[in-house]
Amino acid sequence: MFATVRRYEGIDASDKAELTKKVSESLAPRLSKLPGFSSYFLIDTGNGVMSSIGLFDTSTQANESTRVASEWVRDEKLENILQNPPKVTEGEVIVHKMNGLVKA
């Protein structure tokens, strides 16, 4: 399993609700259709920072999710909300333990 972590900085508090809605309604469904998709999480870490974690079967699939997310930002015209490029980290998940998740 491979993870992609994207950290978005400089998000105005007044834009978080709109961004969250758009991610839920259009990005998450788009990512879930990618081959090898396992799960996706969007995290509000506070202070104008939001991070996402995507889990995929292979490194290539995880990398593709970053391309799809970048394309989505352009398609949704979110450059004004996401003014700074994300800091992207990808790698193999080497420890994983999960109990049942509660939907946010």
What does each model-identified segment do?
Residues 1-51, 57-71, 78-104:
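Short S/T/G/P-rich N-terminal loop/turn motif that feeds into the first structured element of a domain
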